[in-house]
Amino acid sequence: MAKPAARPRKKVKKTVVDGIAHIHASFNNTIVTITDRQGNALSWATSGGSGFRGSRKSTPFAAQIAAERAGQAALEYGLKNLDVNVKGPGPGRESAVRALNACGYKIASITDVTPIPHNGCRPPKKRRV
């Protein structure tokens, strides 16, 4: 016997007041993820996903647009306060933080969580152009 069609349940949006913005700024791209305090992702955006391709992905403006998109998507959860974790040496570090501030979030702290080796792996060879 066929099961009756299950009614689609309304997805309940949880309200989160405090969150963490993780900004991963590499030399090629910038990834902005906004999570709650437990680390569950609320929204994310990248420079490449925001319409930038090639060398334009690694610009501060592309990072700014990615941070704005992630910030606007996370506003639906009622987010007010953010702690910002910045990782990586990329050019979009500062502009992404400024864009989140412009979205209306109260930024409590900015932390640099870039992993620093204690003389671990050998770095890539220097470029010869």
Swiss-Prot record:
Matching InterPro entries: Ribosomal_uS11, Ribosomal_uS11_bac-type, Ribosomal_uS11_CS, Ribosomal_uS11_sf
PROSITE patterns the record matches: RIBOSOMAL_S11
Signal peptide location: none
Assigned protein family: Belongs to the universal ribosomal protein uS11 family.
Purpose of the protein: Located on the platform of the 30S subunit, it bridges several disparate RNA helices of the 16S rRNA. Forms part of the Shine-Dalgarno cleft in the 70S ribosome.
Subunit structure: Part of the 30S ribosomal subunit. Interacts with proteins S7 and S18. Binds to IF-3.
Xref: NCBIfam families: PRK05309.1, uS11_bact
The protein's name in its UniProt record: Small ribosomal subunit protein uS11
Organism listed in the record: Stutzerimonas stutzeri (strain A1501)
